[in-house]
């Protein structure tokens, strides 16, 4: 869910960071981000269907633990690690429907099991009608290229997206 906001079509982002040492000597570090479009401004309108990771991305994480996210997008999976979520976004106020997808190891062609999360089946009811996540149900191997194939309907028009990305061994922020 947090990825959606980080790649949203807002025009302004505010960032604040603070650290605190508690009385029992525990360090707490907080990062606060505010995404907004000021009153009187217009959102940046994406053209067509967009994804993240993007074609050619090499700094995506290979693993993601849904239970570490709040709210949890896959509470039924427990504490297991899965692959990095692949975000799909259609133009604002249009529906993504009839989505089908596959994620394959590009070199060997082996399919990665996936789950497609949309506004229709989101357990937390957080996704908009133009949002979807493709969730690989196993961690992705660092340094290996994965091919992603997506088809569906956006704004009443059929679309298809094909791209590849390579998870990094470590992701430094």
Model-flagged regions — what are they?
Residues 140, 144-150:
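Short beta-strand segments enriched for Tyr within beta-sheet-rich domains
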Residues 125-134:
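Aromatic sugar-binding surface patches on proteins
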Residues 151-155:
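Beta-strand-rich extracellular modules
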Residues 24-27, 156-161:
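Beta-sandwich strand segments
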Residues 112-124:
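Solvent-exposed serine/threonine-rich low-complexity stretches and specific carbohydrate-binding patches
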Residues 31, 35-107, 149, 161-173:
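N-terminal non-catalytic regions of secreted/periplasmic and cell-surface proteins
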Residues 1-48:
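Long, contiguous interaction/targeting segments characteristic
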């Amino acid at each position: 869910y947090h990825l959606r906001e980080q790649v949203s079509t807002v025009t302004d982002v505010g960032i604040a960071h603070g650290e605190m040492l508690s009385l029992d000597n525990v360090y707490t570090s907080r990062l606060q981000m505010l995404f907004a479009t000021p009153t009187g401004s217009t959102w940046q309108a994406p053209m067509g269907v967009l994804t993240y990771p993007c074609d050619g991305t090499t700094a995506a994480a290979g693993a993601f633990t849904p239970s570490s996210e709040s709210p949890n997008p896959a509470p039924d999976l427990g504490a297991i690690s899965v692959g990095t979520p692949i975000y799909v976004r259609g133009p604002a106020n249009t529906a993504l429907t009839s989505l089908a997808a596959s994620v394959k190891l590009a070199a060997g062609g082996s399919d990665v099991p996936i789950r497609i999360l949309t506004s229709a089946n989101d357990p937390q009811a957080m996704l908009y009608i133009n949002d979807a996540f493709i969730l690989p149900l196993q961690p992705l191997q660092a340094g290996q290229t994965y091919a992603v194939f997506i088809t569906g309907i956006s704004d009443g028009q059929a679309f298809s997206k094909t791209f590849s990305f390579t998870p990094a061994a470590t992701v430094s922020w």
